[in-house]
């Protein structure tokens, strides 16, 4: 149930420190990235690792010390995301996990879910390199850096910290590099979508469209995962704004959902289709402007 609450106040610095940095920035100035997918096999080790890693996580804090000060952009970043199995492995109780959306709890590899989103045939989960029943993941470390050398040092440190606490292993490593000409493989300019979020900036889309615990464009608070008050004795989490859930905490506040999809792109096939369609439509319009107006 959605609850109508009106507030467009800018985020406090405390809230910004509680929001992960990748939610509010694509870190476009950092061209090198690594995605390190993890498995947890010891709960206490996983919790200790997360406590020790927490101070290193890049938050959404302002890049300006003062309003009139220049930006101090980070030269490297670290963010984390967890799957439902990862949260369970960290000790999150089942009744809290049940308050998450079914799409998250079931995951993309679930038979009905994969069918709904078109992951069938050659794209079926059974053929995935990871993220399926054969090679599940509990979490991912997202690293960005200003140089390949810096990224490699950060990757080694991340892996070493896992070993030091006796925690699981890195299942798979994926790497990405932003092209110097800012063009993706199809030849189009790759401007990572990054809408302005109201509360982070003075104008933009309401925060609830991207961040849990806030008002969305419809003027409501979307449903957020819940945690019983008895599991938050220190009162670290705010109360749920939903009157039907009095006595429960808003576990999702300042969090969001992340989707990682690995796709194979057929560049030659795409442009072959474009040429064929251009010939078919040649008598109707200028094919170059009709199909390629956004290609740079």
Report the location of each language-model feature.
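Long, low-complexity, Ser/Thr/Gly/Pro-rich intrinsically disordered segments that act as flexible linkers
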Residues: 1-296
